Amino acid sequence: LTNTDIVVLKERAEELQKLIERCHEILSDEGVLKSLMKSELREVKKNYAVPRKTEIKDEITEIKVDLKDMIPKEDVIVVVTNDGYIKKVPMKSFKAATDETTLKPGDFVRNMFELNTRDYILSFTSLGNYLFIPVHTITECKWKDLGKHISNLIMIKENERIINSFIFEKGTSLVLTSKEGMIKKVRMEEFEVSRCSKPMTSIKLKDNDELISVQKEGKKTLIITDNNYYLLFETGEIPEVGPKASGVKGYPIKDNNVISSSQINDSDEYINIFTNLNTAKRVKLSELVELTRNKKGKEIIKKNKTKDYRVISAFTSNVRTINVIKTNDDVNEIKNSDIPIMDSNSFGSTYTKLKVVNVKPKYEFEKIGKTNEVVETPKEVEQPKEEAQISFEDFTNSFKI
């Protein structure tokens, strides 16, 4: 080694010896250790001084975490069927689909929504209950999967049916109508609950009564009974109350029941009428007489001396409406243009020879935040009216006393 190398090595040895002695001192003397820690912390504070963002407490009683923030936000499609099946489909599976979704034989889609996993769905049942369903809890399926019955999410009774479902959006009002003519209006936010594990009351019903209609508030309300009467009045006549209230009389029920209650908006042109004798017709809404709530109403089908025509289904429609006909064996669709436009005196025209179980309008695809969006509806061009063909029996019955 050169003289210079020897000097450098001796200096390095002295430095290491001093460091070893200092480390021994820190480890063996608690006072020296604390003094070192203080000086180093002061140095950190001097170089990186920022206001403290955390709070130090001796004891923390409760930590609140919003579980909704922990749910991954993902756009999905939710399908609800007439028989009460529900499924959540990823957008990728939905966009790749080329066919209709899989359903049980005789079932059909009632609602289809585009929303995200942090949203909620409101489903109303025939027994006057509602289900507040977080979308993220719905079983995820492929578009071609059947899905699960809604009772797998929230238990409902065997005889309880889902009558309508909605995307939960504050600021919207719903109109609820019962079979015995009770009616009320409820703000959608009134249905929000923190516990979603059981059905909640949406309307107080009497024995043997049931909820038959839940719709978003429209400008006018049209009630139709099974003995062929209608009542048209302003929706503003319906009071706004809470979920547990019974509401007020919308129609004076005696020996009849309300079969349909519709909310009328600017896009609606007709009321579609279907009878127990497999006849159907469309009546222009503009031809109906407007009265006030809780009146007897006017006839929507004239009385027949030999045939007991009774309305089994009725709903508002426009030129885009597709009618879903559920029979004992199958489900078929009829375009609105295939149903004749008639007046309130006519019986309608035969549209099938099969035993009809139910008739509903085909679902309209709904998106979160766009449920109140006004969609321009083309007006139907009426064909020249042909002479009505009626049987000699119906003609003579019109003159019987």
Describe every region a protein language model picked out.
Residues 1-401:
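Short, structured "edge-of-domain" segments at secondary-structure transitions
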